[in-house]
Amino acid sequence: MWAADLDGGKPHRARAREAQRWVHLRPGDDRTLVLDHPAVLVQRTTAPEQPRRLLPAELDESCLEEWGGQVVVENHVNVLRKVEPESPLTARLLVALLASDALDRLYRCLTGSVAVSAYELAAIPLPEPSTLLTWANYDDTRLAQEIESYYRAQT
């Protein structure tokens, strides 16, 4: 999966990368290179002229099935996985947060670089778990409004 496959919020097959869709895996490579569980993917590098720095996409179960049950993610893609099963921060909420104009503006304040590092993603202040639990019940439109309001109030 290439970074170009992530624009638009959902992974897709960018035609420009079709000729490069091959990789030779050696024994043991699957432990580190193959992604076979849902995750949130974020482009790791952007061009200065791009209007956004944070370009997330949710790799959910149905998307994984569409891609054959597993993908190899190239090095210009950050892979964000849920490490605390009880966390109220779902993939849907994380994608909505990262796709918001508010977080994109905040991220630009944290860094002047066009690169999106895992370290800087981890530094983004997130709402309290109780807020996330409330947001989980909202439809996409209301969720986007709540995210904008929340971060506007924080500044």
Predicted feature residues:
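Polybasic, glycine- and aromatic-enriched phosphate-binding surface used to engage nucleic acids
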Residues: 1-133, 140-154
